[in-house]
């Protein structure tokens, strides 16, 4: 709370940065960033955005239902007192730890493999993540859950960063920020 208050006071010392409005009149379509949807006319971008949306849906399902899924094993006597059931949140939080650490790998991966291969690694990591999560159990298969949570970092970070760079590379400067927004909407 003190740090937040300190940052609030600091923000009042920053210089005034007026927004450059430009001389041209913008249409409602431009103001709302809807021109980014024109990217769906390009096959490569349409496939990318549809895949991103499907990945985003899968991500939201696993994020939203991971805890109830793990906790549901308490109805099976052999799993009721296992670590994965008793500490589902701790197990799931390994994903965030992995995500935090894997973001440090991105510069290395992009330099050595390039955007397309990093994106392919991310896609394979998503398959591995969902497969391990679906096949694991909180007893003898808890290692699959743990590995699934670790792989999540590579899957999430590599796809989101390489995807953002891909959108940046493939779009015109005039709609780039709208295209980035569309990418975020599709993946989240």
Residue locations for each model-derived region?
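C-terminal membrane-cytosol helix-exit motif in multi-pass small-molecule transporters
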Residues: 3-20
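Juxtamembrane intracellular "pre-TM" segments in multi-pass secondary transporters
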Residues: 16-49, 75
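Short amphipathic helix-loop junctions that connect adjacent transmembrane helices
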Residues: 64-87
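Loop-to-transmembrane helix entry/capping segments in MFS-fold secondary transporters
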Residues: 85-86, 171-186
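Helix-to-loop junctions at the C-terminal end of transmembrane segments
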Residues: 101-115
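C-terminal ends and interior cores of transmembrane alpha-helices
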Residues: 125-138
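Intracellular juxtamembrane helix-capping segments at the cytosolic ends
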Residues: 157-172
